């Protein structure tokens, strides 16, 4: 059970796809950046049961809801803190992670109509942190050879690769997600490795819907649904 406000920010398919794309082991310490109300840590716990998960979020109200969800679900290995990813000095005092996951704000601060609700605007627009802040913070928080898994928009892929390399995080794997066959991708999943060697793998693309509008078998499997029903 996840505590969220009815009129607040809600998680979507992006969080589910990111948790599926991430390679997490039981021995791993995981940090989820821009965690919001904590959906990705709870999905990772249900799927992989890692040793420890820390969610970092700048909005105190979201952190409070996430910690109450952890208490409600009796997940003792998940915790949440309020911190600004631009506060690099504070980040250096946090125990480093084997894996970082992040579903960051997608929209540039000067792009599109900004939501009048500050909380929703911060979740969707690069107001409190931008893509470079996220990747620089990841460099600090990752162990040597640790991995970052990010979900974003395809139009930002060039920025993601450029910034990862700037902070010595090597892009290792990319997967495009399309609404359906014949449509341009609208989601990109990226894996990077701190101080990794140069080798990039492309996963087969994912299609969310079939031609008839039904949900694809691939997506049903990711959600744990029986595709034979």
Predicted regions and their residues:
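Mobile active-site "lid"/loop adjacent to the S-adenosyl-L-methionine
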Residues: 104-133
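Conserved SAM/SAH cofactor-binding pocket of Class I
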Residues: 21-113, 136
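Short glycine/threonine-rich catalytic loop with a Thr-x-Gly-x-Asp
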Residues: 9-11, 34-37, 182
């Amino acid at each position: 059970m996840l505590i969220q406000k009815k009129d607040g920010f809600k998680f979507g398919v992006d969080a589910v796809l990111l948790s599926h794309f991430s390679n997490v082991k039981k021995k791993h310490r995981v940090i989820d950046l821009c965690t919001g109300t904590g959906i990705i840590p709870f999905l990772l716990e249900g799927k992989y049961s890692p040793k420890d998960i820390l969610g970092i979020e700048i909005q105190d109200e979201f952190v409070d809801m996430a910690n109450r969800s952890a208490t409600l679900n009796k997940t003792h290995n998940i915790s949440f803190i309020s911190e600004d990813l631009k506060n690099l000095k504070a980040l250096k005092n946090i125990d480093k992670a084997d894996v970082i996951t992040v579903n960051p704000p997608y929209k540039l601060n000067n792009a599109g109509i900004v939501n009048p609700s500050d909380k929703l605007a911060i979740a969707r627009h690069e107001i409190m942190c931008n893509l470079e802040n996220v990747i620089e913070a990841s460099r600090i928080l990752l162990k040597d050879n640790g991995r970052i898994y990010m979900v974003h928009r395809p139009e930002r892929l060039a920025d993601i690769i450029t910034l990862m390399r700037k902070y010595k995080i090597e892009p290792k794997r990319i997967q495009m997600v399309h609404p359906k066959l014949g449509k341009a991708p609208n989601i990109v999943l990226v894996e990077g490795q701190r101080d990794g060697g140069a080798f990039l793998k492309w996963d087969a693309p994912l299609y969310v819907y079939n031609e008839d509008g039904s949900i694809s078998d691939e997506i049903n499997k990711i959600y744990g649904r029986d595709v034979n029903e």
